[in-house]
Amino acid sequence: MNRDLRRDLYAVAVAALLVTAAAVAGIAVKRDKDVLHVGWPPLYANWLPHTGPGTPAAITVAVAVVVYGPPLAARLPWRALPWACWAAAMAWTFSLALVDGWHRGVARRLTTRYEYLQVIDRFDDIPRALRDFTGHILLGSPDHWPPHVAGHPPGATLTFVLLDRAGLGGGAWAGVLVIAVGATAAAAVLVTVRALADESLARRAAPFLVLAPAAVWAGTSADGYFAAVAAWAVAFLALAVTGHRPRTTALASGLLLGLTVHLSYGLTLFAVMATAVLLLGSRRLRILPYVCAGLVVVPAAFTLAGFDWWEAYHLLVERYHQGAGGFRPYGYWVWANLACAVLVVGPATVAGLRRTGARLTRWHASPVAERRLGLLLCAALLMLLAADLSGMSKAETERIWLPFTTWLLAAGAFVDRPRAWLTAQATLALLLNHLLLTGW
């Protein structure tokens, strides 16, 4: 065992201790007074060992990616690789979701009393619904919105309203949409890493972007869809600053960034990632006008329709403290959230982040491409830590932070023995999905 691998295992052991501490402390808090409002701390889940129709498929996909993922990622033509990543990520996510069965795992996930599909009929008149949106955020308001509708800008709900208008109504189509679109996040991160670092690192990261425990929550939660939209906004920006059809990709990035902040208030933190991409690019000044032009389109449309983003955000903060966020203890969740993140990204990412830190501390001795990928990963970590310290993400971060944790998976590009680490990733995901009944 070489020194680097030994240090990787030390980092994984420390991460495992963090998860163990969060579980033990969480159980103790629940026994004393259940203010955590989660079933199996630190995760929003319940202990329920089970199998389902997705079990054979999930094992098959896992074995296939472990065995064939690294060589295929190294040999496939570049144009085919993002498509292959998307297909594999979609197969992995669908199979994990189906471990809970079609209805419980996919079709009914977005139809509970907390979710967006509960209010589709209240958007028959979309302009009026947008004008009145802020009037239904607080719990004391008439016909207040369900938690997830109140907790997000209306762009999130409008996604499912428009899907319904297209004739694809109901929980099944909504579940299929968020899984299919969410799986494209793997391709978006891949494109970004190639544009800003190099193709070799992107190819090494590819299997880790696919075979991640994060897929347990990407199927089926709307946050997986949000993660994909944000990831493509960054990917298009990376293409723009590196000279790939700069005007078109810059405009597309701006449009998606504008949509991103109207899907989730917390995704304004992607300003950090966008700044990092601009700093890593060589054409930042030329493309900024196009990014800005695209950026104003979606916010302007919502504003003209009568939705006040800032008013809604301030009301959301109040609503958050009216519910579980008001009694969930910050002193526990500020570090237990990080334990959730460990379970989402898996041991390979922990080891990869350890190696990222080592490369950044040896700045001049590290290859330029590795330093650039390291800075991108630091931006993702900074977003995650800012969300954590804000106190607006107490629990359920295994899904809420998917837009941030998706980027950390690229740290897998730095590890040696990829098949062993991919096996660890798959094993963790399969255990989580089969031993726990997760909320999403």
Q: Where do the PLM segments sit?
A:
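Start-transfer (signal-anchor) and selected internal transmembrane alpha helices
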Residues: M1-V19, P41-T112
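Membrane-lumen/periplasm interface segments of specific transmembrane helices
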Residues: A21-D34, L259-H262, A276, L280-A358
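Perimembrane helix-loop-helix junctions
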Residues: V234-G243, R247-L251, T268-G294
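Short acidic/glycine- and proline-prone juxtamembrane loop motifs at membrane-interface regions
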Residues: A214, A218-F226
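Specific aromatic-rich, kink-prone transmembrane helix
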Residues: A188, F226-G243, T249, L408-A411
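Transmembrane-helix motifs of polytopic, lipid-linked glycan transferases
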Residues: A64-P71, W173-L196
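Membrane-interface helix-loop-helix junctions at transmembrane boundaries of multi-pass membrane enzymes
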Residues: R284-P289, R354-A379, P418
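Membrane-interface alpha helices of multi-pass inner-membrane proteins
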Residues: V210-W217, T248-A276, G294-A300
